[in-house]
Every structure is written in structure tokens, then in C-alpha cells.
UniProtKB/Swiss-Prot annotation:
Organism: Rattus norvegicus
Residues bearing PTM Phosphothreonine: T284
Keywords tagged on the record: Endoplasmic reticulum, FAD, Flavoprotein, Lipid metabolism, Membrane, Methylation, Microsome, Monooxygenase, NADP, Oxidoreductase, Phosphoprotein, Transmembrane, Transmembrane helix
Residues annotated as binding FAD: G10, S11, G12, A13, S14, E33, L41, W42, N62, T63
A Pfam family of this chain: FMO-like
Family per similarity comment: Belongs to the FMO family.
InterPro entries given in the database record: FAD/NAD-bd_sf (IPR036188), Flavin_mOase (IPR000960), Flavin_mOase-like (IPR020946), Flavin_mOase_5 (IPR002257), FMO-like (IPR050346)
Role this protein plays: Acts as a Baeyer-Villiger monooxygenase on a broad range of substrates. Catalyzes the insertion of an oxygen atom into a carbon-carbon bond adjacent to a carbonyl, which converts ketones to esters. Active on diverse carbonyl compounds, whereas soft nucleophiles are mostly non- or poorly reactive. In contrast with other forms of FMO it is non- or poorly active on 'classical' substrates such as drugs, pesticides, and dietary components containing soft nucleophilic heteroatoms. Able to oxidize drug molecules bearing a carbonyl group on an aliphatic chain, such as nabumetone and pentoxifylline.
One annotated Gene Ontology cellular component of this protein: endoplasmic reticulum membrane
Residues given in the record as NADP(+) binding sites: S196, G197, G198, D199
Broad class of enzyme this protein falls into: oxidoreductase
Modified residues (Phosphotyrosine): Y56
The protein's name in its UniProt record: Flavin-containing monooxygenase 5
Keyword set includes Membrane: yes
Length: 533
């Protein structure tokens, strides 16, 4: 029997791992990449390309290397825990080379349309029209994996800012920003306090005369560096922490988180405290913002009510004159124009079962990969989604009925609406551990902690209290990797390695990652006791 041919659209993080997932399942991938290289979002270019994600030169990833790597290919131990975008791209190049992925990619090829074949209800096949160097080609595929991301179309709500058309200074979306040199000596307003808004305000404040950071709601600011210097996602992303947070309930979780965040700096005093709870919005990750605020180089302001030719008037009645530049860090919209009616997106809302499969198709041969915004890394989620999708394409896994899928989609949407503030930013939100565990169950690779407690208690303990790293989903089941156990048990060694650039005698009483976790759990238990008794 001939191999099923699968179209993979995009060769960023999701696209690369999906090519590999196809190969693991004996499928034949053909990847279409509109640019001339891999990397997607993480390939920096001085001039942004239309239809392609764009980053600024200084971008550091917000998730640590142990949490963001692909499950069977750890990031080299000497790489920093939080990598510069150039190092992320280099990791992707190593991954592509290691698994021989490049030969399956057709560069400078744009996907024009993806349509059902006339016999789709029985064949599940798709007609894919592509264009390369001005010439169109039509191919038929047995499945399609859409890996185009959700950071390509800038959301620029100019209608919400009266007077912007009269403003004589420069204004643009944060997607166009590259470096702070051109803002030297200028007065700059950054609108939006997501990760990009915070980063830009901090970086520009090193050259600008004054930076104003405008926010509608405020934000809770999370540091990359946690207790004892461990990466914050390493400390927060464990199964035991996840179990306890469910037991404690949302009110106690939020109270505890807000107390921890305010110990670093008082969000109310700094003008950042929002009305929503700490977990009611995706937190902003920024290590330097409080330092720039307390130095007066960044001033936090409310929402802009209107612009004049040279000034901004805020909703509290205050005014800032002689504004030179306005940067809209207002996020992104996403769409799939080449899919026509197969996947409908309305105000950044889309109906996908488990955030992957459109529920209305007669055959489950189309999957959207990486369309999720977790408090954690997207790459390993994309990988698990790809592993699941290729199993479904191959017929190894089945999906529920359309009505069952829609019921779950609506239930998830209602839960997200209750938890998060109404925002374009929260339409594809998902919890990192819950999402990973859920899909791992579907793939058949979720570790059995109870069984391991008897056969390998050391490993079971690490899986329970240690960080929920991607490599844990290579311990058993399809795609099992022989190096998984050792990689899990040496996680702390790789965290420490890039920091040991000066030889220091290690204190035998020093605090290990496990000790830090036990202390955190003890504090959490105490918080529960105090809250309820």
C-alpha cells in the first residue's frame, strides 16, 4: 500500500516537529514554506515579511530550555536556560539536521488554497494549490497539518484611539519594531502591557528621553527567575503543584500567587495592579520593568482616550505633550484564508476539538497545530498535537462524534470565559500541564506514576515533584526513546551547567531543585491550612 501523503504548511517549530511525526508514523510529509528558510517566528529579519511572524533583535524566549525542547532531542546543556532568539533558531537547525527534515521542505512556496476533493466524504483527501516563482501547482494529499502559528497578522485597533489620524508623530504596530536606536532622545508611548509591550518599554527606555506605558487593565508581572535562581517555569510546572492547585481552588490560588508577585514589588504602588486576579489574564513576563519604573524611565499610564497632533490625553484626564512616537503592542489576529470555509475564525475564536481538529469534517484529515496560548512552552504541545494528529490520519486513533466534540468545545469555551477577562488575547488559552497530559493520554504516552512507584520509585518521584518536562512523554508507548529516563534524572545538571562559568566550590548544604520544591509544597500546604482553618 502506498504511503499516505501529508501536506505540512509552515516550517517553524510546529511544522518541523510535524514533519518528524509523519515520518515516525510511516507517512510521507511534504512541507510548504513561503520563505527561504526554516524557523518561523524565531528567525529574525531586519525587514518584516508580509504574512510571516516578526521579532525584534533582542528577544529572549520566555520559557526555559528544559520546558521548551522537543521530547527526544534535549537542548545542549551549555545553552542558557532562557535562550536568545538566535539560539532558538540554531536549536531548530540542529533538530532538522539530526532527523533529516530539510529534504521534505519546499521553500519559497506559498499555499494558495486547500479544498476538499469531490469525493472527500469517502476519501478524506484535499486538493492543495501552491505557488512557487509565479507558477501554480495542484497536488492531492491524504491529510493536512496547518502549522502557520498565530503571530502573523498584527491587530491594530486604530478605531479605538480617536485623533490618531491627526497625530503628527510616528505610529506603528510592535511587529515593525527592531531595535531602540531610532528612539534616542524621544518621548515614546507604548500601548499594551503584554510581553511585547513590556519588553519594548524596557528596551526603548535605555535610549529614549521618556517612555510611557499605557494599559487598559494593568497586569501582573512574572519574573523569569524564581526561588534560589531556578527558572520560574521549572518551579511552577510540576504534577504535584498542579494537583494541589486544583485542590486549593481558584480563589486561594489567586490569593497565593498575588502575594508572591507582590513580594517582589507592590503592583498597586507601581500603578500596575489590575482589577482581575493573577490567573485571570495571561501574566506578563518581564525581569526589568519594575527597575525601569522605579528609575522613572518608564511611567505607567492608563488607557489613551484620544490623541491630538502632538499629545496623548488619557482616560484619567492627564495629558502628555510632545509625543514623538506611539507603538501599538496590541497583539495579533489569526486566520486561515487558504482554508476557505473548512475552519472559520470569528474575532480570534475558532471551534477546534482539543484545539486541533475541526469538528464538522466528514473525515478527520485536517489538523491545526500550535494554535494555543499556554502559560508555558508551545513547542512540546505542538509536538504532542502532531503525534496525535498523525495517529488519527493513519487510522490508529478515532475521534468522537461531531455532537460530542462540539459539546466539549462549548464546555471549554465557557470555562475559559469564567476564568479569564474578555480579551482577544484569551481565545486560545490553555493550561500547560493539563493540555500535555490530556493529549499524551490520547497518544498513549502519559507516564503511569502508580506503576512506576513500584518499578522505578526514583523516577516516579521525579515525575511527581519535578518539572513536567516534554521528555517524560517518551518513556513509554509509541515513539518511546531509550534516553528518556536519564534525561529526566539529569534535568538539574543541565539547568546548572550554563551558569557554572566560574569554578566555585559547591556547598554541600546547598539547595537542590527537589529541596526547593519540597519547601514550596510545605508553604502551599500551610497556606491551605491558614485559609480554611
Amino acid at each position: 500500500m502506498a504511503k499516505k501523503r501529508i501536506a505540512v504548511i509552515g516550517s517553524g517549530a510546529s511544522g518541523l516537529t510535524c514533519i518528524k511525526c509523519c515520518l515516525e508514523e510511516g507517512l510521507e510529509p511534504v512541507c510548504f514554506e513561503r520563505s527561504d528558510d526554516i524557523g518561523g517566528l524565531w528567525r529574525y529579519q531586519e525587514n518584516p515579511e508580509k504574512g510571516r511572524a516578526s521579532i525584534y533583535k533582542s528577544v529572549i524566549i520566555n520559557t526555559s530550555k528544559e520546558m521548551m525542547c522537543f521530547s527526544d532531542y534535549p537542548i545542549p546543556d551549555h545553552y542558557p536556560n532562557f535562550m536568545h532568539n538566535s539560539q532558538v533558531l540554531e536549536y531548530f537547525r540542529m533538530y532538522a539536521k539530526e532527523f533529516g527534515l530539510l529534504k521534505y521542505i519546499q521553500f519559497k512556496t506559498t499555499v494558495c488554497s486547500v479544498k476538499k476533493q469531490p469525493d472527500f466524504s469517502t476519501s478524506g483527501q484535499w486538493q492543495v494549490v501552491t505557488e512557487h516563482e509565479g507558477k501554480q501547482q495542484v497536488d492531492v494529499f491524504d491529510g493536512v497539518l496547518v502549522c502557520t502559528g498565530h503571530h502573523t497578522d498584527p491587530h491594530l485597533p486604530l478605531d479605538s484611539f480617536p485623533g490618531i489620524e491627526k497625530f503628527k508623530g510616528k505610529y506603528f504596530h510592535s511587529r515593525e519594531y527592531k531595535n531602540p536606536v531610532e528612539f534616542t532622545g524621544k518621548r515614546v508611548i507604548v500601548i499594551g502591557i503584554g510581553n511585547s509591550g513590556g519588553d519594548l518599554a524596557v528596551e526603548i527606555s535605555h535610549t529614549a528621553k521618556q517612555v510611557f506605558l499605557s494599559t487598559r487593565r494593568g497586569a501582573w508581572i512574572l519574573n523569569r527567575v524564581g526561588k534560589r535562581g531556578y527558572p520560574i517555569d521549572i518551579l511552577l510546572s510540576s504534577r504535584i503543584t498542579n494537583y494541589l492547585s486544583k485542590i486549593c481552588g481558584s480563589a486561594l490560588k489567586n490569593r497565593y500567587m498575588e502575594k508572591q508577585l507582590n513580594q517582589r514589588f507592590d503592583h498597586e504602588m507601581f500603578g500596575l495592579k489590575p482589577k482581575h486576579s493573577a490567573l485571570g489574564q495571561h501574566p506578563t513576563i518581564n525581569d526589568d520593568l519594575p527597575n525601569r519604573i522605579i528609575s522613572g524611565l518608564v511611567k505607567v499610564k492608563g488607557n489613551v482616550k484620544e490623541f491630538t497632533e502632538t499629545a496623548a490625553i488619557f482616560e484619567d484626564g492627564s495629558r502628555e505633550d510632545d509625543i514623538d512616537v506611539v507603538i501599538f503592542a496590541t497583539g495579533y489576529s489569526f486566520a486561515f484564508p487558504f482554508l476557505e470555509d473548512s475552519v472559520k475564525v470569528v474575532q480570534n475564536k475558532v471551534s477546534l476539538y482539543k484545539k486541533v481538529f475541526p469538528p464538522n469534517l466528514e473525515k478527520p484529515t485536517l489538523a491545526i497545530i500550535g494554535l494555543i496560548q499556554p502559560l508555558g512552552a508551545i513547542m512540546p504541545i505542538s509536538e504532542l498535537q502532531g503525534r496525535w494528529a498523525t495517529q488519527v490520519f493513519k487510522g490508529l486513533k478515532k475521534l468522537p462524534s461531531q455532537s460530542e466534540m462540539m459539546a466539549e468545545i462549548n464546555k471549554t469555551r465557557e470555562e475559559m470565559a469564567k476564568r479569564y477577562v474578555d480579551s482577544q488575547r484569551h481565545t486560545i488559552q490553555g493550561d500547560y500541564i493539563d493540555t500535555m497530559e490530556e493529549i499524551a493520554d490520547l497518544v498513549g504516552v502519559r507516564p503511569n506514576l502508580l506503576s512506576l512507584a513500584f518499578t522505578d520509585p526514583k523516577l516516579a518521584f521525579q515525575l511527581l515533584v519535578g518539572p513536567c518536562t516534554p521528555v517524560q512523554y517518551r518513556l513509554q508507548g509509541p515513539g518511546k526513546w531509550a534516553g528518556a529516563r536519564k534525561t529526566i534524572l539529569t534535568t538539574e545538571d543541565r539547568i546548572r551547567k550554563p551558569l557554572m562559568t566560574r569554578v566555585v566550590e559547591r556547598d554541600s548544604s546547598g539547595t537542590s531543585l527537589v529541596t526547593v520544591r519540597v519547601l514550596m509544597l510545605a508553604v502551599t500546604f500551610l497556606a491551605v491550612i491558614l485559609a480554611y482553618f
